[in-house]
From Swiss-Prot:
SUPFAM superfamilies: Ribosomal protein S10 (SSF54999)
Protein family per UniProt: Belongs to the universal ribosomal protein uS10 family.
Pfam families: Ribosomal_S10
Keyword Ribosomal protein appears in the UniProt entry: yes
SMART domains: Ribosomal_S10
Protein name per Swiss-Prot or TrEMBL: Small ribosomal subunit protein uS10
Length: 102
């Protein structure tokens, strides 16, 4: 292939789902003969939301909700056409956001 590296960035709210998706990608790429670097765990993005429990008053009574976004990075070095075809046909778990950069 003309490009020597494929960079795959994965995002998910559940780290177990993310790790299984990364494991499937790494196993598929190594099976087709490409060199794999990763998965590299990137920093977890944490969003915290604070709301008032009551509808009208009692401002001191609040509730906090947290949302964590886990991220992984996988580099596939020297991919073959067979590697690209296998990655296109790969079925990943739902809830995993995949960004591919060539």
């Amino acid at each position: 292939m003309a490009n020597k590296k494929i960079r795959i960035r994965l995002k998910a709210y559940e780290h177990r789902t993310l790790d299984t998706a990364a494991e499937k990608i790494v196993e598929t790429a190594t099976r087709t003969g490409a060199t794999v670097a990763g998965p590299v765990p990137l920093p977890t993005e944490r969003s915290l939301y604070t709301i008032i429990r009551a509808t009208h008053k009692y401002k001191d009574s609040r509730e906090q909700f947290e949302m964590r976004t886990h991220k992984r990075l996988i580099d596939i070095v020297n991919p073959t056409q067979k590697t690209v075809d296998a990655l296109m046909k790969l079925d990943l778990p739902s809830g995993v956001n995949v960004k591919i950069k060539l």
